[in-house]
């Protein structure tokens, strides 16, 4: 058996039997058939002079096919004095023990370590709670039994190592506990976030309500409540005469062309100042020729509707002059043919006849009043676009004639004739209605 194997076997055996290795010996080379009495007799001749001893146990070594014995010596025995080999049965028996030089080298290294750490042997004893009287009394003097002192020191070092190991383990456990707490907090925060997502609050309900709103609904409401802005703007910027009329009549308001309010405002305006109505009709006839916009047609229709309504809302008994002229259309045509011009009161008479007897007028399909002819079929024909007279050289003169005093009777107007053949007639169904209301 090699020396290294024998030393390893000694260390393991001492650790297993809890024996101090500094007082233990390993004797190898004992034959297999050698008994206990013979082994003790051989060892007694070698170890008895050195001090007391005892055989602890025996073991069989398979590699060498021999036995080995573990021997423990007394406290006063110096291991360096024990021989390493001695004769026995079957050959030479060898002795293996811890080398004292190894212990000296260990002590040297330990002292250097304590000096580097700034520690002393007293600190080691205090930390390990070892109360040794020899160390406290004789600090600088080496102990009498250095082997015993070395054993105590080794025990203290082992205890220090165990304490350091326990401290390191406690720190690791604390770190592991902190990591576990952190993971638990993270899991709790994640669960709380999921709970908040599952149970939204008032802000989430408001957000869902806002998402439910669609832009189409807003567009629909805007389309319903938004007025017809282009038509109002065009009506406001139509002509200067209309602006002047709106300024004079403060009660009249601009209304979209789709919904005319009626004939009250127009009739009152015509009753107050008939010249303003004539100027308005003249101003409207001028843009009809120059512009082709659909807005002008809407304005004309809005002006025609009150005229038709006035014809039906007039008094049942028209003036006598109007009846006479309506009954004799032939005389009117003759006077027109002689003079070559039409008179304004004849148009009023026709309007009154159509308002009074709408059914008989269907038979009279056409009434000629000089160069201008009017078709009277039904009350619906009042909605049709009337024939607007063209401008002629005598239109301005007729306009000057129209500025006559308001007190002229229709009978006096029939005798006078206009100079221009294509001049606009002075009277209109609207004015006739207004005059009838005055009467």
From Swiss-Prot:
InterPro entries: PNM8A_C, PNMA, PNMA_N
Database matches in Pfam families: PNM8A, PNMA_N
Location of region: Disordered: 208-439
Domain of life: Eukaryota
Intrachain S-S bonds: none
Biased amino acid composition, Basic residues: 231-249
Comp. bias regions, Basic and acidic residues: 314-326, 395-404, 423-439
Protein family membership: Belongs to the PNMA family.
Full protein name: Paraneoplastic antigen-like protein 8A
